[in-house]
Amino acid sequence: MQLRDFQEGRRENDMMSPMTAGLSKADMQELATYFSEQKLTNKRFKADPEKVKKGIAKADETLCAMCHLGEFRGQNEIPKVAGQNYDYVVKTLKDFKAKNRTNDAGNMTSVASTLSDEDIDNLAHYIATLN
């Protein structure tokens, strides 16, 4: 759970880290439930169809569905990233690649280390189009 990772220092963010400091497990579960029920909107981003196709191919090649399941819907502690903001996906993948983010037991760091900037761009285009 991302909130726990902020609280325990496995993820760092100047805003989120202090906000999670006093949260109980029940508080975090309540917040997670609330946000998981919100409908994602991504009206401003216009994906490039060619990049989406390349993103689908790269997702298949790197076996993203093994952890994130089909269409990046997530499971257990593996987050749903379908429909996530393009810029967030790019930043997250680059952070894993640079080992600036390490709350993944090494899985995402390992996968991201194989991605080029073009791969990251294409994956972000694809992921941002999913619901």
Please place each PLM-identified region on the residue numbering.
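Extracytoplasmic c-type cytochrome modules immediately beyond a signal peptide or single-pass transmembrane anchor
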Residues: 1-51
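Gly/Gly-Pro-rich "capping" loops immediately C-terminal to redox-active cysteine motifs
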Residues: 1-13, 17-22, 71-98, 109, ...
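The canonical Cys-X-X-Cys-His
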Residues: 31, 35, 61-71, 123
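C-terminal capping alpha-helices of c-type cytochrome domains
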Residues: 21-43, 87, 113-131
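A general structural signal marking secondary-structure boundaries and capping sites
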Residues: 10, 38-42, 71, 100, ...
